[in-house]
Amino acid sequence: MRLVVIAIGRLKQGPERELADRYRGRFDDIGRKLGFRGFDVHEIPESRARDAKQRIREEAAAILALAPEGAVLVALDEKGKNIDSAAFADHLGRWRDESVTSTVFAVGGADGLSPELRRKARLSVAFGAATWPHQIVRVMLLEQIYRAATILAGHPYHRG
């Protein structure tokens, strides 16, 4: 299974980019051994539309255009479920074992994700009740993907 993160906005050079790259690299090392075929990250520029609803629609269309056909869609959304790392790993492991070809993680911009995109998501995940900057959400997501791989591999990184 291929993992794809599609995020609105760009991570500039700095500590967030360094952490994101570190977790992605760590995943690459362990992910291949677990049957994951790759890990792509796509950054989409924020919409310039003046109206928030229009921005959300344009950003959702851009996310869906990059999502491979038949992919499982996971929305990172403040209204999503709070799941623990083991449950997150269970989802990834199950989809891999079901021969899902791709899992797409959608990270919205400042205005969030469109209702249409949220409806299409098989899973909607929140990292707590707080609202997080998209740069931090991206780092947290990449860490959780790496942590999920270590859980699936029985690696001691996750001690929960």
Swiss-Prot record:
Q: Does the entry feature the keyword Cytoplasm, yes or no?
A: yes
Which NCBIfam families does this chain map to? PRK00103.2-3 (NF000989), PRK00103.2-5 (NF000991)
Q: Which reaction does it catalyse?
A: pseudouridine(1915) in 23S rRNA + S-adenosyl-L-methionine = N(3)-methylpseudouridine(1915) in 23S rRNA + S-adenosyl-L-homocysteine + H(+)
Name the SUPFAM superfamilies for this protein: alpha/beta knot
Q: What pairs make up the disulfide bonds?
A: none
Q: How does it assemble?
A: Homodimer.
Could you say which EC number(s) this protein's record lists?
Answer: 2.1.1.177
Principal location: cytoplasm
- What does the similarity note say? Belongs to the RNA methyltransferase RlmH family.
Please provide an example of a Pfam family that matches this protein in its UniProt record. SPOUT_MTase
Transmembrane segment boundaries: none
According to the UniProt record, one GO cellular component term is: cytoplasm
Transferase as UniProt keyword? yes
Which domain of life does the UniProt lineage start with?
Bacteria
Role summary: Specifically methylates the pseudouridine at position 1915 (m3Psi1915) in 23S rRNA.
Can you tell me which residues bind S-adenosyl-L-methionine? L76, G108
GO molecular function terms attached to this record:
rRNA (pseudouridine-N3-)-methyltransferase activity
Which gene does this sequence derive from? Answer: rlmH
- Main EC class of this protein? transferase
For this UniProt record, the keywords arranged alphabetically read as follows: Cytoplasm, Methyltransferase, rRNA processing, S-adenosyl-L-methionine, Transferase
Q: Which InterPro entries match?
A: Alpha/beta_knot_MTases, RlmH-like, tRNA_m1G_MTases_N
Q: What's the protein here called? A: Ribosomal RNA large subunit methyltransferase H
Q: Where in the cell does this protein reside?
A: Cytoplasm
